[in-house]
């Protein structure tokens, strides 16, 4: 019945819940037979109507709980029975029964094939069980036969054999236990041999074997002994791990790592390793500093050993400061190199293990190993920053323990060089910018450099005041890179190894310090050696001085006996890079010196000893800036002050002349004036002595300033024979131009280290100061030009000329010859000066331009002094000027002649009509009021009347009014 209900449920029907017992209550609800099924199927059916009948059956009939159907139906009857209603209800129940029976019949017929198939399977199973029963019966019969065939003796033999096997096993166990008891001797030997993996492997195997025999009473004591041995191995292993921190050995470290891996303590080993590195840094720096302190103290007092590291650093003497710092950095380098090689080892073995794991099949062990490798990698990467931070703090404490302001410049530079190399190590070690080290030395460097710079400025003033402005002869191919102070520029562009050891590798990838010194050596040892080598290079001979024959030939043409010693050092040909060979013939040397002399005359730089000192000072400043880039701005600012002071001194000595500005020729550009005013306000102490009433702020400001320099009394600038000190003026001015050129050459190097926010200062310095150096030529050489020609004498000669002639003259006036004679004399004296000092073409052109410009303006001034002039007189003026130009062009190559139009335009203005002259006066404001007024007065009576004269004079006055 349950099966029928489940079938009806899957068909979406609600089956009545009556059981077989319930069916007995109503005969009408019994299961129909086959005949009845057939009749039910043959009856015409309406599926929809049947479904509605089934749906109309009450829910209680589908309940799984048993209940009394008869009682249920009787209780439903009303108190008053109605026969018709009862019959209708009965018919309804019959219809519902019929519908359910028909549905059940359909479902049974539908499942008939499955029933047949299941019945066949049951029959087959029954057959198999019967066969199994037969086999079991046969087996029991055979067992009984075998049991009856064995005797008691056979069973006894088997028991003895079993006992024998047990005794053999016991003997093996006893021998193994005996071997385990003697294992401690072998373990001690292996520990002495530092075979930690083997010792641990043996100990673990013994423990594993002992656990097999734990049922023996003697094994418990052995287990305890093995555990103690294992702990002893771990202690020795930790000691071995600590040795890695100062001297990394691949084989040693490989054994240690294998041992920790066998113990399953790879992560613990890494934690211990970092602790040992931290301890190694502390112990190393303390021992190094303690050694120097005790050495300098000269006694064996143990009080220093009880001091803290910070207090110990204050006891380092200045003499031992640099060696101690170098040894400190060497020792710290060894620690960091060991850490670097440790990371290399792990990286290499990680790759090997990853490749091996890819071929293996043990997934669980591979995952665990991968996790360990990941932990070790992260720990090592994190340790980089931590270790470098410890190194920085230790070195910072050492640096701040001594006052560096008392050090000599070279010693201070060497300290900075060591610290800079250490910061380079830090950047390669972990990518750190070493803020701790930079900050610790930046303030000291700035303070040191301020004091140093102040002393250098005072020295520069002393040099300038003692300078006689004599030419310092140098080679035609002289370059500041040949100077010792600028060697670092070439070294910074080449590898730090010597050329003989430099590999001929084509790869452009830079070699790090760790790669370079991984197999041996120390970058801080190279640093000290490098300094010694440079000192020897500076003192080296140039290869000519040792041979007297060659030296005499050299002196025949260009003796360099007066060349400063610093310029004789380390001369190398720029074209070949080779030192001149000593074994050359006298003739070859002579011809070479002739060509050198010629080059010197044409191209040799013009500079003085003071200029050279400034250049050397700039090189030293750049060395400090290159080593300590955070103070680059301060250093460049001080460098600019060196140039400013040199420029101001040249202007003060040779270019300051109030009469220059009155000419109105714009000899000093507005940019040059602004620069000079800025220098005077910011750098020059004009008071000369301290004012006791000055405020503290003013006193501090004056400390930053330098008194204005005074020209050496030996320099004579008033002699006409020397063209008023032209040689000294040329040397001074052109040395400034040369200095500016060197600053231009160094600009890319300065720009590379200047902080981005400060680069506008550098750009302004170059655009407003360095570029104005050549502009000093005009005011300085103008003073020579103003005195070299006797312009006053020419004016007197012009005043004696009669200009109101009535006929056209064919002969020029005598003042023209006098002026040309002055120019010839000027040219002669200029040639005399050029024998002492090479006069560059730009200087020669400026001198000639100034002289010609002054001469032409003097001519106009002379014409403006004329009281009466006729048309023929004006023609005579033109004749004189043309004659002057024709002869002048033979003396100079300057084209066009300066201010030529200035004279010609003034002469031609005489012929202008009233209206044209008024317009001309307004357009030509380059002429003075006197010159314009004289022009109008001279024209009066010829072609201008008095009324027109008044009008023109009023126009001139109107033009002149804004100038007052």
From Swiss-Prot:
Q: Which GO terms describe its cellular component?
A: EARP complex; membrane; perinuclear region of cytoplasm; recycling endosome
Q: Where is this cross-link: Glycyl lysine isopeptide (Lys-Gly) (interchain with G-Cter in SUMO2)?
A: 963
Q: Which InterPro entries match?
A: Syndetin_C (IPR019514), VPS50 (IPR040047), VPS54_N (IPR019515)
Q: What is its main location?
A: other
PTM annotation (N-acetylmethionine): residues: 1
Sites of Phosphoserine modification: 15, 494, 498, 559, 561
Covalent crosslink: Glycyl lysine isopeptide (Lys-Gly) (interchain with G-Cter in SUMO1): 963
* One Gene Ontology term of the molecular function aspect: SNARE binding
Give the signal peptide range: none
Keyword flag Zinc: no
Q: Which residues form a coiled coil?
A: 81-107, 216-244
- Region entry Disordered, spans: 1-25, 532-563
> A biological process (GO) annotation for this entry?
endocytic recycling
Q: Where in the cell is it found?
A: Recycling endosome; Membrane
Q: Which family does it belong to?
A: Belongs to the syndetin family.
Q: How does it assemble?
A: Component of the endosome-associated retrograde protein (EARP) complex, composed of VPS51, VPS52, VPS53 and VPS50/Syndetin. The EARP complex interacts with EIPR1. Interacts with VPS51 and VPS53 in an EIPR1-independent manner.
**The protein's role, per its UniProt record:** Acts as a component of the EARP complex that is involved in endocytic recycling. The EARP complex associates with Rab4-positive endosomes and promotes recycling of internalized transferrin receptor (TFRC) to the plasma membrane. Within the EARP complex, required to tether the complex to recycling endosomes. Not involved in retrograde transport from early and late endosomes to the trans-Golgi network (TGN).
Q: What is this protein called?
A: Syndetin
Q: Which organism is it from?
A: Mus musculus (Mouse)
Gene symbol of the encoding locus: Vps50
């Amino acid at each position: 019945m349950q099966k029928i209900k489940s079938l009806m449920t899957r068909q979406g029907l609600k089956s009545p819940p009556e059981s077989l017992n319930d069916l007995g209550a109503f005969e009408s609800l019994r299961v129909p037979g086959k005949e009845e099924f057939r009749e039910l199927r043959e009856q015409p059916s309406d599926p929809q109507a049947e479904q509605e009948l089934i749906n109309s059956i009450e829910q209680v009939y589908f309940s799984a709980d048993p209940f009394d159907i008869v009682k249920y139906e009787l209780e439903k009857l009303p108190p008053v029975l109605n026969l018709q209603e009862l019959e209708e209800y009965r018919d309804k129940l019959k219809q519902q029964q019929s519908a359910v029976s028909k549905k059940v019949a359909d479902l049974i017929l539908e499942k008939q094939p499955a029933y047949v198939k299941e019945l066949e399977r049951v029959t087959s199973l029954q057959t198999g069980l019967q066969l199994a029963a037969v086999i079991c019966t046969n087996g029991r019969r055979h067992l009984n036969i075998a049991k009856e065939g064995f005797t008691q003796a056979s069973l006894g033999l088997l028991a003895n054999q079993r006992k024998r096997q047990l005794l053999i096993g016991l003997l093996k166990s006893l021998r193994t236990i005996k071997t385990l008891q003697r294992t401690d001797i072998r373990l001690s030997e292996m520990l002495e041999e530092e075979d930690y993996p083997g010792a641990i492997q043996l100990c673990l195997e013994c423990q594993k074997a002992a656990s097999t025999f734990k049922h023996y009473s003697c094994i418990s004591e052995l287990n305890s002994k093995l555990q103690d041995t294992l702990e002893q191995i771990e202690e020795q292993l930790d000691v071995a791990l600590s040795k890695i921190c100062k001297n990394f050995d691949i084989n040693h470290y490989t054994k240690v790592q294998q041992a920790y891996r066998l113990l399953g303590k790879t992560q613990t080993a890494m934690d211990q390793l970092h602790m040992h590195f931290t301890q190694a840094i502390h112990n190393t720096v303390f021992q190094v500093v303690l050694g120097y302190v005790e050495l300098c103290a000269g006694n064996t007092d143990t009080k220093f050993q009880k001091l803290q590291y910070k207090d110990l650093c204050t006891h380092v003497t200045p003499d031992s400061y640099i060696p101690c710092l170098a040894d400190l950095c060497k020792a710290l380098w060894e620690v960091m190199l060991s850490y670097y090689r440790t990371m290399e080892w792990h990286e290499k073995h990680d790759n090997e293990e990853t490749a091996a794991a890819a071929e293996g099949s043990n997934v669980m062990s591979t995952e665990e190993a991968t996790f360990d490798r990941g932990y070790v990698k992260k720990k090592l990467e994190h340790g980089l920053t931590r270790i470098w931070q410890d190194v920085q703090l230790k070195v910072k404490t050492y640096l701040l323990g001594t006052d560096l302001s008392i050090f000599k410049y070279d010693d201070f530079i060497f300290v900075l060089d060591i610290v800079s190399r250490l910061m380079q190590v830090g950047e390669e070690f972990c990518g750190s910018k070493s803020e701790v080290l930079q900050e610790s030395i930046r303030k000291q460097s700035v303070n040191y450099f301020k004091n140093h710079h102040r002393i250098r400025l005072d020295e520069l003033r002393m040099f300038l005041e003692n300078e006689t402005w004599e030419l310092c002869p140098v080679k035609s191919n002289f370059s500041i890179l040949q100077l010792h102070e600028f060697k670092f520029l070439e070294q910074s562009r080449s590898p730090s190894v010597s050329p003989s050891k430099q590999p001929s590798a084509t790869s452009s990838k830079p070699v790090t310090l760790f790669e370079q010194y991984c197999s041996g050596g120390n970058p801080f040892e190279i640093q000290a050696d490098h300094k010694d080598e440079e000192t020897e290079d500076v003192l080296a001979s140039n290869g000519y001085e040792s041979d007297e024959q060659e030296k005499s030939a050299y002196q025949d043409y260009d003796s360099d006996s007066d060349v400063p010693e610093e310029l004789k050092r380390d001369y190398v040909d720029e074209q070949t890079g080779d030192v001149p060979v000593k074994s050359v013939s006298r003739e070859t040397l002579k011809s070479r010196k002739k060509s050198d002399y010629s080059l010197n005359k044409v191209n040799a730089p013009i500079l003085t000893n003071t200029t050279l000192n400034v250049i050397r000072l700039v090189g030293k400043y750049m060395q400090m800036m290159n080593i300590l880039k955070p103070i680059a701005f301060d250093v460049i600012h001080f460098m600019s002050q060196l140039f400013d002071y040199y420029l101001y001194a040249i202007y003060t000595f040779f270019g300051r002349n109030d009469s220059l500005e009155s000419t109105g020729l714009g000899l000093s550009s507005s940019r040059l004036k602004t620069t000079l005013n800025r220098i005077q306000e910011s750098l020059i102490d004009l008071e000369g002595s301290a004012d006791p009433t000055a405020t503290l702020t003013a006193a501090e400001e004056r400390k930053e300033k330098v008194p204005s320099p005074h020209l050496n009394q030996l320099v004579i600038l008033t002699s006409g024979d020397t063209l008023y000190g032209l040689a000294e003026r040329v040397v001074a001015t052109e040395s400034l131009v040369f200095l500016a050129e060197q600053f231009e050459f160094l600009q890319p190097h300065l720009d590379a280290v200047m902080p981005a926010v400060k680069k506008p200062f550098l750009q302004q310095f170059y655009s407003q100061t360095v570029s104005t150096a050549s502009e000093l030529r005009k005011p300085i050489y103008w003073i020579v030009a103003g005195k070299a020609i006797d312009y006053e004498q020419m004016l007197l000669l012009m005043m004696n000329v009669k200009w109101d002639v009535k006929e056209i003259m064919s002969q020029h006036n005598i003042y023209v010859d006098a002026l040309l004679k002055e120019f010839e004399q000027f040219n002669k004296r200029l040639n005399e000066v050029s024998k002492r000092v090479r006069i560059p073409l730009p200087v020669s052109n400026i001198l000639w331009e100034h002289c010609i410009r002054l001469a032409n303006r003097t001519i106009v001034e002379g014409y403006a002094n004329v009281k009466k002039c006729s048309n023929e007189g004006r023609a005579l003026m033109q004749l004189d000027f043309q004659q002057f130009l024709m002869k002048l062009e033979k003396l100079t190559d300057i084209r066009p002649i300066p201010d030529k139009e200035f004279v010609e335009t003034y002469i031609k203005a005489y012929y202008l009509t009233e209206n044209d002259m008024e317009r001309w006066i307004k357009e030509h404001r380059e002429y003075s009021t006197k010159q314009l007024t004289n022009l109008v007065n001279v024209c009066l009576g010829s072609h201008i009347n008095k009324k027109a004269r008044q009008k023109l004079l009023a126009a001139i006055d109107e033009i002149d009014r804004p100038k007052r």
